[in-house]
């Protein structure tokens, strides 16, 4: 079925999730009657390099638009996507560089903890919240991530961190 992907990061910054909600949600705002999936915006935040700081609670980042500071936590990201009214929302995840195994494991664990918090924060029965599998280029970490997330009981899953600096051979 045709589906549109919208990005929470960009919509959060401009025009703002609450404004979109007041205008009737993404479907009405975009004039799209079919399913809409919103990405958490995690990839965009992590691509900001010098404009972001990650900790176990979330991510502090500066807007690429005006330099203003914002804090993404799992709860903020879920609330934003709920306000947007997407049919499918994604948890906040940490997109780590793929080659550093120790950091890939750390980021994977953080993503799992954020996924648990996202599930607790999620309130819309009419919106599916998906978990995101991570683990860099390491097959065993990817398998561990998939097992951990499926045990949490998400209705769907995405594969995160692909095409984030790995070679074709990886």
Say what each PLM segment does.
Residues 109, 121-170:
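Glycine-rich phosphate/ribose-binding loops and adjacent secondary-structure elements
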Residues 1-123:
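Non-catalytic, usually N-terminal nucleic-acid engagement modules in DNA/RNA processing proteins
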